[in-house]
Amino acid sequence: ANGQQMQRFGSYDLGAQNLQALAAADWRLAPGWTLLGSVQWSHLTRDAQRRSSAAQLNQDWSFATPKIGLNWAATPTTRLWANLSRSHEAPTFWEIVSATVAPNSPATAQAELVRLKMQRATTIELGGAGRWGEGAHAVHWTAAVYRSVLADELISTTDANGIKVGTYNYAGGTRHQGVELGLSGSQRVGTGALDVRASWTYSDFRFRGGEYAGNQIAGVPRQLINAEVLYRMGAWRFGPHVRWMPVSTPTDHANTPGAEQDAYGLLGRKLEWRDGPLALYVQADNVTDRRY
């Protein structure tokens, strides 16, 4: 509070390396049907050395991520697909270097290095994309449903003040599943056109076992809706956009009653100028000054 410099408590030299190799192939099984397969091999390293001592933590992971998919061109304007894949996610330095800073006692701040496993997942996805109509005023749509079963998910925790406490691998297993829908199009109105874009996501992310078995993973909105309606005249577009979270979201993994983030809706405005690949815009979010 008096402007004096605090002690340095987390000074590290960090080094990362990513090596990857990919092989992919596709086979046309029949008119409109294509089978796709790929496998990616990765080797990642994350090294951290504390500058003020000999403390260090060097970690590396090697893994393969296969994927197989089937595409069907149902019509000239409609494509459907099914995918089965494995994925891996290595921890970041933000998760490996864990800092503890008490708001009412910053002089006791400290940092430590945390050894973490890779997060692994198996995912199945069904989806489709297409359009209704032709030309510049066609309506485009996308839809997908997915389910992922995860092991050793990287879970972050915070204290009652919202300060990050740390990250660890959740041993009880987790599950991510949901639905994603998107719609976009343009319709002529007067001397210009009305560009519409909307998306809806439904996310059911839960702990499968362990301490929080059955609970919703904190901070992941169960439903989220984004939409914008922009009127276009020449190179200019302007109009409103909306971000709406229609249901409350838990803020802790224990799903404590009364500790949820309440549902909210935010209204914004956007002004955009576009000329070929160049675009400039001014955007104002939450123009109604809603607290959320």
What is the predicted role of each segment?
Residues N2-A74, A90:
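Signature of Gram-negative outer-membrane beta-barrel scaffolds
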